[in-house]
């Protein structure tokens, strides 16, 4: 279902529902205004004024029409006034979120919570080292005096006016918001907005943790499973890293196969410069060097702190989908744009919904008029994702590698690094962290001039100076310099075509995105413009056959041999316009296929020089499924079709892995019927837990999952009552019920088989867990690759040694592990109880709760722990790598209950039709626009979101009037 626009939703006459105690909000009873002043909408009988609000600094009166979803529509005569009002309204509805985001980004959380939670000190240290506040200050200082700076300042002033009312007690914080005193809401500034903007770029593009973890993994794998090991079990696993860590996507779906090619590029793909590789290998330090192991392990505190910071917006597994449909493939004859970025599912939502309409007074220059709607990150003025009258746009993270970590050699006094054989003095910046309940902590951040800051060794909530004998790690990131992202975003507001939008985005440098867009002329376009570093050949001295050498997604030598040489030329940054397929889709996937051969190092530019975009692209299932749905669609696509694709919950892993599970079950039955047929399974079939009748029923269930439901990961519960759907019959509900039972069995099996197959090796290496995506790719590789081509192939068993459990004297086989994991899953189901109609359903365990930003605010979670129906969260369909993202964290437990809840997913579900007569947009955000449990707009959109429904978003004035909840005239005192 695409729209639910017939239901006006819960209404309120109060024009300031998010802050009912604001004394300047005006009369909420619809009484006549106290003066004849009106905003740009004038005196209209179909749009009576419900209240008035005074804001300092306005040049002209502004109208705010709040619709039935709590979305403000701002009508102003100039953009500066509009930004001032947007800042005010955002602070009115999201004050707590603004303050927490600001303090997180600037590294000032400990000032409030350091006594209650000392880990906030570590988090502040980690973010101060990167210096987002320093970068934002430099960025603001570099802004010329003009409209952009005026808009930033006006937005900041609007926020400040609300914060001052909070400090004075004229506006009260929402109930349940404990632990933050009113005086903490200090005045806002343009720098604060820029630091929040850079914080989001940091979360979506800074990946030093990945480089460090990757290097730790490689070092541990090579030292633990060396071919020279005296332990035969370890020796058989030599090459473990090649089977576990796969750079190629499991589903080889790319956005564009038409990237510029040339004979030189193809030649370079097949044979890199061998001399450069040999030369750099001669200089390469020993990958298992104890010194580096000590250096990497010293960053445990830093890595934990960064993980906590990321959880606010982009936890592990974040991603996004978007696509654009050309008018020629659209059922409406107009271009369509779909956008569902997958970010943290929190309360409040990460996005704030708003529309902005700027119309110059009659007789004035109308060339600067703006009519735009969509969503923005609270704290950032304007609109980030959405549409104007002519163009609609969405974005997904491009996953380009724009961060490098360098192993620095220090001089004996620790005050300089060695670079190209010469000492280069470290620069330092003093940081003072205020901490609640104790004295401030003062320390200095050391910075390598040609790379960036040294990453901190955090011990007992303080920074330990690096040991010169061990060295240090520095980080270089494209976001360490001032750039012009906000200018690029504001340019989109006035773009009249996809070409103008692309030109505006040419100013976008940090936090690379796959921007897809469509316009009223029917054209579509994709661009990934960003500052993408080019690197010297020595940074790619990698042998894909042996997994040895140097890659930018691991730790690079800091001696000057693996440096950045510039940025990728603009015309070579992946992009496309109006492709022959009639659509463009992205999902954090490899855009051009450079990693499909599992070698991220051998790409080349048309002239044959190195070309590298990254080595951590998505596993590929979402992109593949989106393309499959669009390609298979009979006839043109409608907005409803796009919404249905956004809600697709086919289990990608189920479709790939269930056939292997069924084969193992068949082989077990063959062994039971004729002992000795498959002797590796004799122990399984003799196990008391092996019940042939039950296994046959499970086999039929899993087989039917594919046959009748195409591996749909259905919730299997009534989304209004939470009761399980009946599983008998042939109706859609019964099919969903059976599919949900199969989904639960499969995912229980999945977490067990990952643990039983890979947990012993990872444990030997010192890892209690690892990336769920890497684990899934490894499992798929073990199942699907030619066995003899596996690095861990054991001739004695004609299969990978990884199937064998290192902790037992027996030699377990592939099928034994598969079936043992299934018995684990069934034993867990037995402990849950229920059968038939009462059998456990996937939706009872696969749930989502929009957790409040801080545990202190748990009563502001959606649903709260006290919710009478959904205390465990909303039941949801989907599973790992589904288009409708709902990835849980792979559990390593064998006996304890796995946690199938999830914390990230679609942060909006936007579909835009670019009709020349006026755009139409449908959307829903997870939660509501106002973070106040007393507001009717606290969780109203959550009811749509959790059922994969959206509503028609009013944009044209007649639609806004029809959806009106209140009109407020905002004017200067």
How should each PLM-predicted stretch be described?
Residues 3-37:
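Ser/Thr-rich, Pro/Gly/Ala-heavy low-complexity intrinsically disordered linkers and tails
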Residues 32-336, 341, 347, 359-361, ...:
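Substrate-recognition/specificity elements adjacent to catalytic centers across diverse enzyme folds
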Residues 81-122, 126-135, 394-442, 558-619, ...:
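Gly/Pro-rich active-site capping loops and adjacent beta-alpha segments
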Residues 82-86, 134-152, 476, 486-492, ...:
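Second-shell loop/turn segments in exported
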Residues 356-382, 386-556:
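Glycine- and hydrophobic-rich flexible loops that cap the catalytic core of alpha/beta enzyme folds
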Residues 510-633, 709, 735, 741-767, ...:
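Hydrophobic alpha-helical segments
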Residues 596-678, 795-973:
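Terminal end segments
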Residues 715-825:
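Charged, long alpha-helical assembly modules
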């Amino acid at each position: 279902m695409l729209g639910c626009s017939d239901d006006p939703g819960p209404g309120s006459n109060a024009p300031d529902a998010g802050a009912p105690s604001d004394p300047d909000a005006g009369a909420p009873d619809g009484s006549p205004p106290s003066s004849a002043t009106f905003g740009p909408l004038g005196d209209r009988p179909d749009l009576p004024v419900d209240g008035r609000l005074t804001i300092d600094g306005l040049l002209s009166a502004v109208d705010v029409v709040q619709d039935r979803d709590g979305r403000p529509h701002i009508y102003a005569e100039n953009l500066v006034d509009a930004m001032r009002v947007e800042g005010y309204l955002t602070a009115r509805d999201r004050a707590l979120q603004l303050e927490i985001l600001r303090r997180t980004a600037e590294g000032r959380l400990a000032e409030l919570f350091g006594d209650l939670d000392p880990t906030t000190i570590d988090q502040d240290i980690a973010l101060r080292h990167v210096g987002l506040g320093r970068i934002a200050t430099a960025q603001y200082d570099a802004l010329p005096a003009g409209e952009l700076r005026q808009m930033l300042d006006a937005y900041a002033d609007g926020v400040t006016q609300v914060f001052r009312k909070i400090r004075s007690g004229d506006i009260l914080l929402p109930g349940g918001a404990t632990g933050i005193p009113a005086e903490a809401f200090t005045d806002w500034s343009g720098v604060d907005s820029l630091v929040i903007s850079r914080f989001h770029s940091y979360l979506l593009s800074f990946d030093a943790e990945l480089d460090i973890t990757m290097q730790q993994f490689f070092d541990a794998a090579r030292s633990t499973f060396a071919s020279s090991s005296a332990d035969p079990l370890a020796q058989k696993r030599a090459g473990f890293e090649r089977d576990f860590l796969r750079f190629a996507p499991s589903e080889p779906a790319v956005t564009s196969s038409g990237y510029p090619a040339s004979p030189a590029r193809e030649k370079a793909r097949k044979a890199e410069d061998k001399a450069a590789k040999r030369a750099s290998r001669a200089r390469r330090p020993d990958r298992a060097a104890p010194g580096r192991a000590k250096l990497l392990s010293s960053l445990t505190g830093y890595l934990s702190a960064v993980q906590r910071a990321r959880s606010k917006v982009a936890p592990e597994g974040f991603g996004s989908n978007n696509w654009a449909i050309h008018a020629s493939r659209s059922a409406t004859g107009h271009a369509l744009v779909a956008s569902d970025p997958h970010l943290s599912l929190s309360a409040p939502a990460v996005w704030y919904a708003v529309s902005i309409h700027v119309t110059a007074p009659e007789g004035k220059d109308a060339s600067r008029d703006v009519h735009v709607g969509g969503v923005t990150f609270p704290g950032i003025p304007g609109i980030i994702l959405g549409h104007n009258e002519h163009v609609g746009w969405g974005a997904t993270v491009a996953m380009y590698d724009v961060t490098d970590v360098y192993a620095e050699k220090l001089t004996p006094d620790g005050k300089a690094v060695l670079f190209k054989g010469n000492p280069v003095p470290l620069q330092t910046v003093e940081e003072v962290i205020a901490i609640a309940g104790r004295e401030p902590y003062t320390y200095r951040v050391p910075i390598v001039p040609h790379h960036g800051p040294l990453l901190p060794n955090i011990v007992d909530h303080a920074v330990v100076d690096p040991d010169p004998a061990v060295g240090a790690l520095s980080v270089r990131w494209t976001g360490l310099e001032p750039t012009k992202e906000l200018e690029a975003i504001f340019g989109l507001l006035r773009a009249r075509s996809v070409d103008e939008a692309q030109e505006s985005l040419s100013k976008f440098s940090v936090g690379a995105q796959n921007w897809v867009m469509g316009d009223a002329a029917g054209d579509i376009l994709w661009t990934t413009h960003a500052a993408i570093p080019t690197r010297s050949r020595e940074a790619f001295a990698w042998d894909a056959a042996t997994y040895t050498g140097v890659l930018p997604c691991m730790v690079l030598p800091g001696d000057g041999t693996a440096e950045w040489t510039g940025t990728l030329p603009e015309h070579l940054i992946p992009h496309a316009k109006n492709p022959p397929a009639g659509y463009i889709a992205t999902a954090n996937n490899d855009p051009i296929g450079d990693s499909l051969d599992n070698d991220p190092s051998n790409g080349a530019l048309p002239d044959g020089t190195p070309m590298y975009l990254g080595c951590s692209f998505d596993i590929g299932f979402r992109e593949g499924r989106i393309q499959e749905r669009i390609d298979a669609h009979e006839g043109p696509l409608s907005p409803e079709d796009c919404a249905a694709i956004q809600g697709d919950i086919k289990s990608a892993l189920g479709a790939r892995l269930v056939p292997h599970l069924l084969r193992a079950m068949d082989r077990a039955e063959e062994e039971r019927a004729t002992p000795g047929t498959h002797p590796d399974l004799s122990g399984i079939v003799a196990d008391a837990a092996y019940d042939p009748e039950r296994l046959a029923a499970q086999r039929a269930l899993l087989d039917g999952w594919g046959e009748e439901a195409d591996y749909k990961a259905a919730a299997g519960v009534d989304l209004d009552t939470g009761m399980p759907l009946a599983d008998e019959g042939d109706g859609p509900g019964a099919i969903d019920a059976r599919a949900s039972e199969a989904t639960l069995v499969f995912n229980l099996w999945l977490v067990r088989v990952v643990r039983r197959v890979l947990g012993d090796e990872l444990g030997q290496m010192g890892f209690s867990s690892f990336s769920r995506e890497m684990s899934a790719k490894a499992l798929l590789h073990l199942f699907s690759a030619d066995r003899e081509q596996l690095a861990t192939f054991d001739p004695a068993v004609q299969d990978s040694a990884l199937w064998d459990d290192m902790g037992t004297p027996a030699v377990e086989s592939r099928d034994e592990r598969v079936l043992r994991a299934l018995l684990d899953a069934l034993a867990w189901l037995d402990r849950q109880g229920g059968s038939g109609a009462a059998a456990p359903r996937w939706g009872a365990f696969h749930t989502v709760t929009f957790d409040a930003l801080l545990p202190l605010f748990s009563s502001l979670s959606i649903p709260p722990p006290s919710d009478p129906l959904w205390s465990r969260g909303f039941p949801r369909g989907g599973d790992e790598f589904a288009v409708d993202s709902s990835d849980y964290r792979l559990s390593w437990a064998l006996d304890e209950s796995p946690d199938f809840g999830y914390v990230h997913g679609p942060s909006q579900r936007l579909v835009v039709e670019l009709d020349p007569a006026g755009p139409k947009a449908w959307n829903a955000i997870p939660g509501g626009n106002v973070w106040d449990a007393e507001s009717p707009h606290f969780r109203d959109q959550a009811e749509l979101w959790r059922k994969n429904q959206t509503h028609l978003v009013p944009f044209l004035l007649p639609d806004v009037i029809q959806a009106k909840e209140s009109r407020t005239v905002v004017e200067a005192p």
